């Protein structure tokens, strides 16, 4: 809620939540602030890294210098410059600490992505034990994916309002309890119900993890850390079937859920002790101790941690002054914006096909002409896991490189007068451009995978196409998560849940229809049809790349005009009201 004049209005969800911040300049580089490359050179000279604490200085920007810096840098460039050279650093976490946070977030979210594919190799065992057909057993997969898309849209708002830590930990606890119930489930109906509960508990962790990374990174490094976090978290989806096949072959399907119980329980204990609260409206740059005990990690009570986080000298200026408003429909409103919807639909469909591919590996390799055992099928998932791992590491670096390159060209053109001074940097174009090559490449690999399974081609064709497809899927996820955090830094968990909702909803639809489509079109025909939809959909992404930022600016202007007119109307109403003279309704009775 933003206070404006005599009344309050809600921010339009299509715009970022802006708050008035102190203006800064850095005294060591004021003379050469026209070049971003000079800042990069200084970074290298000092051995510094974005987000480190050691080399930053800050002073208030005098009014006579404000216009000079404003005219030489875009908003994105100024943001990174101010953050990098600010005496109150954007985050007290150094480079090593940030990677430790990535490891903790992976421990949280890994079990969400693992919960679905670890189950695939055991589907045949469930069919036999409960005497159900393929369509019914697929329902247990579909409901998990469905709630994996829906639950984060609500939990993301809770995390943006009450903090990341309590929502993550409560979700993990629900997941552990549901996994115990699944391991002991006596009937098919109980399995379906507890799969819903299991998904509701753990699925928000993926979106919230992106929000946590957005809390302690700036745009110039965000791609690396969001990409790594998203990629590591979703490695469970790539390696899950390998683990599930080993467990089901050694024991039975119940061993899978005991494994999830033990693994997530251990991760819960680690995260409970070590994971700090990062929501900037609660802890700022981590120098402010949370008031709510649920937001306090035990490790931060140690003297060494207190000194590192500077609890004795908190910097309240780093607090996000925007008051988050919990809205259950917030994620859906963001997702419905044209530039967001057009950006998310093609990658979401491509990612849903990846989920379908992982399921198809198990079902197709267990049938003729392959007739592989569970252990061999599990090994066949290894290339998909390796491809996803490479995609996670490589894409983050590519995204950051693309961002810096585009921003540098933009700054040079602005300095040369080629583009207007008031034009904003097109961050949507920079981020989406890094997605398109992978999205077009996966069209080819999905078609080849489908026909490899359909015609019984040699197994290397299936392994290679699954590896490349996994690389593309992880690349797409990293780029889209980074873009959403960039566009909505104040509610990054809610924004990240939009892509989660899109990809999981489409995955649930495809999984629900796969058996019938395979029967009607064959595996090759099904993957060819869906890959064609991805190919056509990819061209939709060119629309937000070109017009997305303009649409957002137009909505900002309309929102500003609406706020101004409401202010004026309220002011006129107040003046009119003050001129009205009221007589008392109570009159003394006349004496008779």
Swiss-Prot record:
Q: What does this protein do?
A: Multidrug transporter acts as a determinant of resistance to acetic acid, flucytosine and clotrimazole, these 3 compounds acting synergistically against the pathogen. Reduces the intracellular accumulation of the antifungal agents flucytosine and, to a moderate extent, of clotrimazole. Its role in acetic acid resistance may be indirect, presumably through the transport of a still unidentified physiological substrate.
Tell me the organism. Answer: Candida glabrata (strain ATCC 2001 / BCRC 20586 / JCM 3761 / NBRC 0622 / NRRL Y-65 / CBS 138) (Yeast)
UniProt keyword annotations, A-Z = Cell membrane, Glycoprotein, Membrane, Transmembrane, Transmembrane helix, Transport
> Which region ranges are annotated with the description Disordered?
1-77
Q: What outcome is recorded for mutants in which this gene has been deleted?
A: Leads to intracellular accumulation of flucytosine and clotrimazole.
Q: Transmembrane ranges?
A: 99-119, 139-159, 166-186, 188-208, 231-251, 255-275, 340-360, 374-394, 432-452, 459-479, 497-517, 523-543
What is any one of the record's Gene Ontology cellular component terms? Answer: plasma membrane
Q: Name one Pfam family in it.
A: MFS_1
Protein's gene: AQR1
Listed GO biological process terms: amino acid export across plasma membrane; cellular response to acetate; xenobiotic detoxification by transmembrane export across the plasma membrane
Query: Could you tell me what this protein is called?
Result: Multidrug transporter AQR1
What is this organism's lineage? Answer: Eukaryota, Fungi, Dikarya, Ascomycota, Saccharomycotina
Membrane-topology annotation of the record: Multi-pass membrane protein
Q: GO terms for molecular function, please?
A: monocarboxylic acid transmembrane transporter activity; threonine efflux transmembrane transporter activity; xenobiotic transmembrane transporter activity
Q: Which residues are glycosylated?
A: 138, 285
Q: Which PANTHER family match?
A: MAJOR FACILITATOR SUPERFAMILY, QUINIDINE RESISTANCE PROTEIN 1-RELATED
Family to which this protein belongs? Belongs to the major facilitator superfamily. CAR1 family.
Q: What is its main location?
A: membrane
Q: Where in the cell is it found?
A: Cell membrane
């Amino acid at each position: 809620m933003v206070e404006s004049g005599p009344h309050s209005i809600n921010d339009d969800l299509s715009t970022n939540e802006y708050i008035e911040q102190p203006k800064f300049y850095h005294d060591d580089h004021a003379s050469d602030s026209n070049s971003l490359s000079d800042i990069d050179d200084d970074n290298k000279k000092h051995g510094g890294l974005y987000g480190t604490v050691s080399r930053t200085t800050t002073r208030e920007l005098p009014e006579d210098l404000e216009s000079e810096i404003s005219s030489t840098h875009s908003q994105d460039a100024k943001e990174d410059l101010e953050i990098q050279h600010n005496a109150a650093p954007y985050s007290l976490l150094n480079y090593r600490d940030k990677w430790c946070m990535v490891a903790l977030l992976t421990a949280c979210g890994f079990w969400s992505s693992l919960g679905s594919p670890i189950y695939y190799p055991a589907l045949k065992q469930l069919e036999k034990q409960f005497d159900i057909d393929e369509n019914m057993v697929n329902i247990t997969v579909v409901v998990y994916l469905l709630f994996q898309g829906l639950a984060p849209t609500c939990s993301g708002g809770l995390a943006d309002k009450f903090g990341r830590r309590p929502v993550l930990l409560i979700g993990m606890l629900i997941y552990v309890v549901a996994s115990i119930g699944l391991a002991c489930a006596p009937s098919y109906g109980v399995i379906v119900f507890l799969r819903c509960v299991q998904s509701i508990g753990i699925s928000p962790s993926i979106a919230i993890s992106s929000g946590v990374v957005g809390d302690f990174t700036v745009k110039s490094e965000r791609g690396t850390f969001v990409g790594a976090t998203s990629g590591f978290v979703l490695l469970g989806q790539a390696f899950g079937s390998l683990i599930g096949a080993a467990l089901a072959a050694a024991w039975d399907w119940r061993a899978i859920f005991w494994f999830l119980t033990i693994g997530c329980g251990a991760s819960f204990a680690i995260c409970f002790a070590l994971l700090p609260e990062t929501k900037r409206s609660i802890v700022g740059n981590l120098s402010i101790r949370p008031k709510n005990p649920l937001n306090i990690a035990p490790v931060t009570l140690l003297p060494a941690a207190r000194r590192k986080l500077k609890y004795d000298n908190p910097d309240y200026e780093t607090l996000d002054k925007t008051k988050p408003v919990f809205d259950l429909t917030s994620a859906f409103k963001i997702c419905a914006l044209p530039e967001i919807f057009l950006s998310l639909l093609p990658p979401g469909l491509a990612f849903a096909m990846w989920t379908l591919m992982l399921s198809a590996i198990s079902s197709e390799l267990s049938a003729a002409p392959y007739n592989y055992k569970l252990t061999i099928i599990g090994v066949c998932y290894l290339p998909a896991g390796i491809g996803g791992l490479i995609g996670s590491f490589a894409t983050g670096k590519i995204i950051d490189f693309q961002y810096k390159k585009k921003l540098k060209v933009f700054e040079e053109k602005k300095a040369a007068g080629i583009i207007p001074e008031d034009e904003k940097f097109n961050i949507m174009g920079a981020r989406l451009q890094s997605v398109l090559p992978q999205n077009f490449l996966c069209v080819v690999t999905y078609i080849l995978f489908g026909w490899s399974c359909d015609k019984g081609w040699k197994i290397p064709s299936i392994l290679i196409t699954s590896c490349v497809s996994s690389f593309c899927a992880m690349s797409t996820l990293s780029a889209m998560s980074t873009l959403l955090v960039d566009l909505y830094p104040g509610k990054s968990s809610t924004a990240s849940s939009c892509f989660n909702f899109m990809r999981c909803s489409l995955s649930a639809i495809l999984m629900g229809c796969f058996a019938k489509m395979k029967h009607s079109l064959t595996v090759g025909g099904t993957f060819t049809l869906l890959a064609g939809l991805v190919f056509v959909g990819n061209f939709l992404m060119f629309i937000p790349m070109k017009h997305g930022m303009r649409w957002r600016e137009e909505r900002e202007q309309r929102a500003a005009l609406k706020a101004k007119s409401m202010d004026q109307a309220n002011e006129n109403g107040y003046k009119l009201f003050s001129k009205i003279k009221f007589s008392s309704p109570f009159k003394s009775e006349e004496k008779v």
